[in-house]
A protein has these predicted regions:
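Active-site nucleotide/adenylate-binding loops and adjacent lid/helix of ATP-dependent enzymes
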Residues: 2-12, 18, 30, 60, ...
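A short, GP-enriched loop/loop-strand-helix hinge that lies immediately N-terminal to
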Residues: 15-19, 63-107, 122-125
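Short catalytic helix/loop segments, enriched in acidic residues and glycine
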Residues: 21-37
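A generic structural motif
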Residues: 36-44
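Conserved dinucleotide-binding and phosphotransfer motif residues
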Residues: 39, 91, 119
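General small-molecule cofactor/ligand-binding pocket signal
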Residues: 44-47, 96, 127
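Glycine-rich, highly charged phosphate/nucleotide-binding loops
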Residues: 44-63, 78
Length: 145
């Protein structure tokens, strides 16, 4: 048995009245917990919020062998999902999923578009609101979403 070896599962805090999409992470948590328990690991589950001190404290107290990162957003904002990996990286804790840098770059639409353009990947023309007066691509009729 490996019960002295802790695995930590982190996920975003979910309201019990949330949408099926939001609640799905709890199904994932149970599946991972069951698999790890079956293999003899001690498992701790931590809902992560914007109080990242709590995550840091749990990491320091439990010293997990590995963290299963199931965080999909923080405080309902996908753009913040790079924060838990950044904490894990700072404490040199191995974890599943992408690191903070790729998550930061890919969850910001404008940052991702700029990176694709710099790499020579064609993207549709775009502009930000402050540049609209200096931009010639906005002439014509559009459907905005």
């Amino acid at each position: 048995m490996k019960t002295d070896i802790t695995m930590l599962i982190i996920h975003q805090e979910v309201d019990e009245t949330g949408s099926p999409d939001d609640l799905d992470v709890l199904v994932q948590v149970e599946q991972v917990r069951n698999a790890l328990t079956l293999h003899g690991y001690s498992v701790q589950v931590l809902p992560v919020t914007l109080n990242l001190h709590r995550l840091a404290d749990v990491i320091q107290q439990t010293r997990p062998l590995l963290v299963f990162n199931l965080v999909e957003s923080l405080d309902g904002k996908d753009r913040l999902l790079y924060l838990p990996p950044a904490i894990l990286e700072a404490y040199h804790v191995p974890f599943t999923g992408s690191g903070s840098d790729p998550l930061y770059r890919t969850t910001g639409k404008l940052l991702a578009k700029e990176a694709m353009q710099m790499a020579g990947v064609d993207t549709p023309p775009w502009f930000t609101a402050p540049l609209r007066d200096q931009c010639d691509i906005i002439q014509g009729t559009y459907i905005l979403k």
